[in-house]
Every structure is written in structure tokens, then in C-alpha cells.
Amino acid sequence: MSSREKSHHRRHSSPCNSDHSDHSDHSNYSDEIELYSNKHKRDKDLKIEITSRCHSRSSDSSSSRSSSPSSSYERKCKKNSHKKDSYKKNSHKKDSHKKECSDSDHQDKCSFEEIYKYYKYRMLHDKELMVTGSTSYLCMNNNEIVTIPKNYEVKLNNVSLKKNIDLGYINVPYYVREEGVYILFFVINSNQSSQFSFYVNGLEQPLTRYGNNSGAGQLILRTMLKLKKNDAVVIRNSRSSAATVAADLYVGGSLPGNNLTYLMMKIAPYCQPKCEEWDDKHLSKRKLYLFKKLLDKLLLDKDLMLKGFDIHGTFHRSTGVIVTTDTDVPFEATTNVNGLSWSSVVPEKVNILEDGVYKVFFLANTTTAAQLAFFVNGLAIESTTEGINIGAAQVSLRALLELKKGDILTVRNHTSANGSIEISEKTGGKQNDVDAILTVMRIAPLVQPTMDECKLNDYHKKYYYKFKQYLLNQKCLQIAGSNSYWNVTGDTKQILHASESLDWSNTILQENIWHYQGSPKFTIMEDGIYDLFADLTSNQPAQWCVFVNGTADLTTCFGRDSGGARTLLRQFVKLNKGDVVTVRNYEASSDVIETSTNAGGELVGQSVVFMAFKLSPITECVPCLPHHPPHPPKCDSKDKSKKPK
């Protein structure tokens, strides 16, 4: 039989048993009705279950067989639930009084201005950053006669400027309201040998104990300390040789002037923020474009100081000059000037180009008693008047001043007792050195910015840390205060021939500097402009200089024609990574210089101190050229049918 015949036979074979076939069909039909009925019942039960519990699924086998209707009802239920949630969120947005983007918004619904405000707010309140420069500082002076017995505290009666530092009932202690790294300066004008030191929370800081063996000169304490929030700072007569130290007025001139000056300022956070390795490839092109655009706007924001203490400069002279009464000290040269202006045509004046709080310092070697003061726009700042009663010595002034764009700063021989004063040259040695210097640096904006708390969606919030790391890795920025500093001292006798380096036996602080105790060398690890301070007490006239990579930096050479007192050295110096810095006996008049031991008092004192901190980076920030974002903006989520143009 052929296959075609077999197929035909199969199709027509059923009628042979018609009775049995009919019965079988009827039975199958009944079974189908029963099955449908059971299925309908199960579906009905399943609907009830899904309505009461939208997100649960039946685990039994019958429910598994009916998964298709279950999925349909689940989707419908979820859709209704989503509509309710969306309605609640929209209602919450309408009731909200915030003008910023809500967390439920899509990332593209936050404007650039809102994103900028949010990131700026976060940076202003980030304790690891100092995007507005120094946020804690104090400047005080005293114009009354005072006597200070041994172990008694020093009290000053006038506050020139302060921020985030509170004073006790008698103007001491000084309570620090922000933790951080601080530089502290104290000056007393006394006719007696004296020894003073800093105390923190009632405990003496022995490595800050300094003294002078000779009277009729300024004793200057300077140090750098890490202070915690609410620490109490006091200056005390440690154990001076005299039973009581008197600070006199009318020193070097016809005005009372100041016999005591105190200044402190925060230069860095207590701990430097962690700077992770960075690669722009970690970001999408769109996010990188946003970060660059934010940085461009931040650099133009007058509230901020993203480049550190980048407005600075020194103005100095290396030849002698006579300064008559009521005339200003002229300068011959400048070093590392940025954001200030000076002209050799009018060499006495420094022009301020940006508003701000400025730290100003002046130092000169004179052959006679002298009394000088800072002048702004031709008017004396009386609180800065200071002097010395002897010649062959250094006179110094320091202050924090609020200056505005267009102000003119000068140093004037206003009221010296001898009328004209002579600024000497080749002091303490055989070579030309710096005989008068004015240093100027902006430490903070004139007005600290305040902002209300900003809200932003979660998408942009989570990128703040990455944005912070992006800024920390920009070589042209310094958003976390000074990220490189050191403070070292020496308290033992050192005998130095010409060109020999000082050793430093005590390290108080160091950050991003390679140095070990007992070594004369400091290896720089961060490029930048550094503010260098050195106070060096010797028994003979001295001439000191900072050497960089074995070569004298002549802008840092300072001397003093008398022994028994401190020689001050001060300069802003450009240093590169890998540079090696030392302080040496340059070419003093004496063949040998011997440092003093326990000057001015009965306890161990520091005869030499050397400290520095980075003011600003060397690298210039280059603004990004205007360009379009790498991708067009996404469609608004409310109307996804529209395509971007």
C-alpha cells in the first residue's frame, strides 16, 4: 500500500467504530467543560489575591499554569501604584518652599547655576578645604605700660581684627574656634633681657620658648602649631632673667606706639585631605565638560581663593638710604609679585589691586633709634606704630589690615625721635644684603561669603567627592590651604664658619617636605611660592642666607650689626620639587658665628628657628575655551517624543 493510500485509509477509518467514537467525543467534551470551569475558578481566586497583594506571586503549580493572566494583572497594579507614587511626589514638590531641584527630578532638570551653587556651598562647608583662604585669624596690640612678672600671662588691650577666635574676660586666653595649622607671632619691646613662650590649654610648649640677651630691642616669638577647636592659647613670661619684664611706650619716637603685638592666622586644615590618583578618563566626556565649566566659573568668583594665598609680593632694597621725617621708605626691587603693583618711578608705593584682608610685614636695619608705621592712602594706621631705642639693630612691624582695590600702602618714618633715620647696608657682614623689606599677602576676602543650604538631586550629589578630587589634582589650585610647610628649631650651641649650614635638632611640624632631625637640608616636594621665616640668635654680628641647591639666594640674605639679639630673615621664594634648601652663615664680619644658648632666661630656649609654608602654586590656571558640550542635552522626561535639535 502506497503512502497516499495509507493516509487516505487513516482519514476514513474512524466511522468503522461510530458508536465508540461518539461516546469518546462526548466524554472528552465533558472533561473540557470541567477543566474550563476549574480554570475559571482559579483565575477568579488569583485576581482576588493579586488585588490584595500586588507584588506577590503564587508559588503553587496551578498559579504557575496561569502565569499569563497573573503578569497582566501585576503590570496593571504596578502601573496604578506608580501613578499614586508620582502624584504624591508631585504634591510634595508643590508644597515645598525650596527653589532648588528636588531629589526626584531627572539630572537634566537642574540648571548649571543650581549645580554651581550646590558645589560652592559644599566646598564652603567642607572642613578639609580652605576655599576662602584663612577663616580664623587675630591681630592685637597694646598701647599701655605693662609689667609682666615671671610665669604671668601677657595681656593686650586692643583688638585690630579677629575672626573665629574668641577672647577671655581680660583678653586672654585666645580660644580657637576652628581647628587647623596656625602661625603665631608675638613681639615685646623691652629694655631688659627676657624669655617668653606659648602655652596651649595650660601646658607650656617648650619648643616655642625664645629670648633676647640684650635689652632695648624687640623680642620676637614665632611658631607654627596644630590647634584643635576650642584650644586656649596664652603667652607667658617663661623664666626671664629679670624678676619682672617691663614693656615701655614711646620707643624710638614721639608717639606712644605699641609695646606688645600679637598675630595669629590659620594657614592649613588640621589634616590634609586625601588626594587620590586621578585620570580624566575616569569621567564621561559630558561629566568632564561640566567639571571644567564649573572650575572656570569658580576661578572668576571673587568670594573664593582657589589658588591659595596667591596675591602676594615682596618689595626690598639692598643699599643704604636716609629717610627723612614724614617720608616713606623707598624700595629698589620686587620678588614674586602677583596681584599687586609697584613702579620704580614711585618706589615707595605698593598698589592694592584686589579687596581683602592682608598680612603686612616690614623689616629694616637702622643705625639710629627709629619709629615707623604703616600708612594707607596717606593716613597713618596708628595701631601699627612701633620702634626701637638703639641703632645697629632691626626694627619690624606686622599687622593684619583690611584693604580695598585702589588703596596705596607705604611705610613711613613718621615720628622718629632723631628725625631722619638711616637704613644701613652690608649689615653684619661683607656682602650686600637685604636691608629693608616689605612683604604683603592676602589671607582672606574682605567679606566671607554666606550661602543658604542648597538642595540638589541625588545624581549630582554623589559626584561632589569626584569633583573635589578633580580640583585637588589640579596643579594650578590650592583649595586646602597650604599643603607644604615646616617648623624646626635648634636649642644647642652651634659654631659656624663661612658657608657652613645650621643643623635643626627639633622638628615641630612638617608636611610634604623631606627632612629629618639633625639634618641641615630640606627637600621640597611641592612646587610653589614659599614664605620663609628664620630667627637666628648669635653672640656676634651675623649675616645669614638661604641657599637653594648649594647656591645663595641673594634676596634672602639678611644681617645684624649687633650681637646678643636675633637676626630676622624673611622672603617669598619660588621653589621647585626636588630643590634642597639650607640656611648658612653667608659672609659674616666675624670669622666664626656662635649661636646663643638659653638667651634671656633661666630655662632652655630655642636659639634658632626656621619655618616656611607654601603660599600658592607656580602653575597658571588656563581657562577652558568656550565650546559646546560633547553630547546634546537629553529630552525632557515629560515629552520623550521630541528630539533635540
Protein language model regions, located:
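N-terminal acidic, proline/glycine-rich, low-complexity intrinsically disordered segments
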Residues: 1-12
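Long, low-complexity intrinsically disordered regions enriched in small/polar
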Residues: 31-57
